[in-house]
Amino acid sequence: PIVAVLGHVDHGKTSILDHIRSLGSERQSSVMDREAGGITQHIGATEVPADILNEMCAPLMGGKKFDSPGLLFIDTPGHHSFTTLRARGGSLADIAILVIDIMDGCKPQTLESMRILRQAKTPFVIACNKVDRLYGWQSEPGRVMAVSMRKQTSDVMALFDQRYWQLLG
């Protein structure tokens, strides 16, 4: 399956993919470090083989295995100048991840990405990114988000809930 990653500039699309690339036994190098100004200016592709998927998702899947050859992630640029590349990535995908900075919320290219995905009839999930910037958030590098959330105080979770539901309207 092909997974497109779309969203506004600087909302962390390439960083999320770099994190995925760094997991598992077949670690790959960081793409963001090689991007001019840290901004994606072309469509990039990352393959995540089934064995890495199974390794990454084991804590969430309870030992179940993916019956898939793996995933091909397409990283699309978020800058307003690259609408055509976002549209191309969104229309190629079987599913998409719409990345939104939880502190910034929906921005122009976020809304444009939603329109692209709707027009292409590409199903998508929303990934709230930069959650670690919420005041009081206790980061646990390498932890699954669901586990990290259980470790937060009620005040921090109230702030998370407020920001999360603001994004969803």
Residue spans of the language-model regions?
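P-loop/Walker A NTP-binding module and the surrounding RecA-like catalytic core of P-loop NTPases
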Residues: 3-169
